[in-house]
Amino acid sequence: DDLEVFHHSEIIAKLQKEGKLPEAEKNGRSITFHDPCYLGRIGDILDAPRSVIGGVDKETERHGKDSFCCGAGGAQMWMEEDADKRVNEIRAAEIAETGCDTVAVGCPFCSVMVKDGLDAVGADMEVLDVAELLWEQIVARDLEIHDKTKNRTGKARIWKSSLSDLV
């Protein structure tokens, strides 16, 4: 039996298209996206993560199929590198050059490596997975709904859904 595997950004994008998840809103953020090596170069999944976050405000110099590794690929994360040649710091400097305040990622290893690299180069950027950016929107929307639906006793009607309602 063959199993079809999807990246979470593909599932989120599908659910957004079907109206089961909200469309992306940047809420004042300027966003760039770091393409994970396997996602972009091997999986050719370039559009879904960008769609989920409402597009990018500025691409890094090397992006898409030509993206540069975060430094975790091939188990690099656990190897010692020369202090002046750390891959994650090189990549972080490229990301910081975009001038964006947020970098979206689609891989937990990339998240760790990019955060560490940005700290090392002194860049003040937030690193969030595409799903975390969407989650922020859902929470903000639900708080807005909560405020609008308070009844006279001050209690709120809570909207609930489960994953089975979405797929």
What residue ranges belong to the model's regions?
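Iron-sulfur cluster-binding electron-transfer modules in prokaryotic oxidoreductases
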Residues: 1-167
